[in-house]
Amino acid sequence: VLRAYTDVEDLEQGKSVHGYVIKMGLEYEPDLLISLTAMYAKCGQVTVARFFFNQMKLPNLILWNAMISGYAKNGYAEEAVGLFREMIGKNISVDSITVRAAILACAQVGSLELARWMDDYIMRSECRDDVFVNTALIDMYAKCGSLDFARIIFDRTLQKDVVVWSAMIVGYGLHGQGREAIDLYHAMKQAG
């Protein structure tokens, strides 16, 4: 039930279920800690989510993803990046969900130096050929003001879907490079 309220971001009903969990004495069950962290993070209550995150002695990947995504999606970019750095510092395996949330946070920070660090990390990871990760990298570089690096990612992405093309086109448009955006749009149409 808690997951359903998380999916629709119904904080009030989620709190109601949380109250029931407390009443039943199940608040510190690992699966419920994960669900509570995810629910509060997704609903914008990142401080509460972090409290539950901190209750786990050995947070699993789902919990790390929930917390990093929660920070990134609610404008706590520095916290998301910091938690991602902590995660990789502890040699905890990441997945494309983790990486995309960290990329979103890097884009929000807007630091080209941080963007380059993220890109370097991804190039050494198993996510380097993930089309969703590469699309996020293109968007990140565009938001950090580097269309040159965005284009490098675009060009090295072998499986270009419409979302990859669109990310690069939007990047050009974002920086007033209408001619490049139109040319790339025509190239996309020709590519099929």
Can you describe what each PLM-predicted range is?
Residues V1-G192:
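Alpha-helical hairpin repeat boundaries in alpha-solenoid proteins
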